[in-house]
Amino acid sequence: EIKDSMCEEQKRSGVLLAGLEHLDDRYLKAVGYATKSKKGNGQLPKMVLVGDIVGDDADEVARVTSEVVRIANTRSGEGFVAVSSEARKKFWLDRKRTAAISKHTNAFKINEDVVIPLPRMAEYTDGIERINIELSLRNKLALCDALLEFFAQGELPLGQSEDRISAAELLEDRVHQAQALVQQVRAQWADWLANVATLFPELQEHRLRASWKTQLKAPMAHIFSGQAFQPVLAELNKIHQRVLKGRVWVALHMHAGDGNVHTNIPVNSDDYAMLQTAHEAVARIMVLARSLDGVISGEHGIGITKLEF
């Protein structure tokens, strides 16, 4: 809508849309974006568009910029305008920090740029979001499996207790409670994954949310309450961090004015399973792009990972 409006405006007044860049919420988190909105208690927006609107007449530029803000408002968005040189520089600074997306993987990522027709862009971002939801749920199921393996090993690490109680007495049925909890949560998450096509709107809007903190960590702290069980809880957190480190996800930033989308997958180069999962995601991304009448050769052309497609 912005692009169409600006194309007409260029013919009418000569005001140009010189650039239009996009960052999704994963990129916003990576670059440390400080939201300008007063809504949502400071939460990050789902995406940010940064545009350069230029012209010879300052009043015309201001009028057209206000129209772009109005378009954003009609789509539950907000618009913020930088007029001075210093303010404009700050607006564009976040876009320049996009390499931060792979800082947790020592700057290693699979970068697949594709070009999508602008009228199909929303379908592409939805498709990527579905891939991300599936990857997240698969990682959550792997976490459950790792936790069940930990509880099945027998002896759990225990701290000192002021009372002279044996480890067996301390644990009593706590392990069984923990196992039942994990199995119950795992069954729910597995059902969501199996029915992701139907449940996608609820999962995308976080009306359904697979949460380690609320569904597993908090109940575990209740089951294993007391000083003697601190080592158990510490080990559960270690397991979570280890499994989370291998989670694959897809982040998007794009030259939104022409449909060139950088589809980036940060990976640990020494994690074979993670690399395999990432390449499976690439295959789905290529199919998705072409199904929307897009092309898989963006501004960076064809590289090793695209060769087979």
Where are each of the predicted segments found?
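Noncatalytic alpha-helical scaffold of FAD-dependent oxidoreductases
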Residues: 1-298, 302-309
